[in-house]
């Protein structure tokens, strides 16, 4: 499979060969079966773009329209999703209880499911602040085809931008590895 810039997507499905990823792929399959529109970001997207590595979760950005978020909620119910504790807070101490209404209000959720961890990112300062930001990311997304259906993966440059904004140690490692894997000489 080729990317829009002509470079080969070397990571396509390679992430699936990493031990322990079967559960994570099951999360994607359930999202697809529930017709959830989303973009794959995070470690699985890094693998898709040429640097397969182990990851502990599936990271997605869902399309922000209410119908899609209702479909996402149905998938979350099927997955038995429950919020993880955030820092010193237990799930019951969060300002909004985990519900469809809370999902519709936006925000980010770190969830435990029957197949592993799922992180839902609906807001990221500088990248995901409006519905138009999702549309922009979606316009640069590339397909990833699996036996259970097509997943849209955030584009290479957008992934680099999201990783740069997050700025965690793992994100910086991913950026370097992606650039090496894709022979990208940008700083």
Spans of model-derived segments:
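Compositionally biased terminal segments of proteins
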Residues: 1-187
């Amino acid at each position: 499979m080729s990317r829009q810039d002509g470079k080969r997507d070397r990571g396509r499905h390679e992430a699936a060969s990493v031990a322990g990823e079967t559960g994570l792929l099951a999360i994607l399959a359930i999202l697809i079966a529930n017709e959830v529109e989303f973009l794959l970001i995070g470690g699985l997207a890094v693998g898709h773009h040429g640097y397969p590595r182990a990851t502990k979760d599936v990271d997605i950005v869902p399309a922000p329209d209410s119908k899609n978020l209702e479909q996402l909620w149905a998938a979350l119910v099927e997955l038995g999703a429950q919020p993880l504790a955030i820092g010193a807070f237990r799930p019951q101490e969060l300002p909004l209880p985990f519900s469809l209404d809370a999902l519709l209000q936006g925000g980010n959720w770190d969830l435990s499911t029957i197949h592993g961890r799922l992180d839902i990112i609906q807001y990221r300062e500088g990248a995901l602040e409006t519905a138009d930001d999702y549309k922009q990311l979606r316009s640069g997304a590339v397909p990833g085809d699996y036996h259970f259906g097509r997943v849209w993966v955030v584009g290479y440059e957008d992934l680099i931008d999201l990783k740069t904004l997050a700025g965690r140690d793992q994100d910086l490692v991913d950026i370097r590895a992606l650039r090496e894997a894709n022979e990208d000489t940008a700083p």
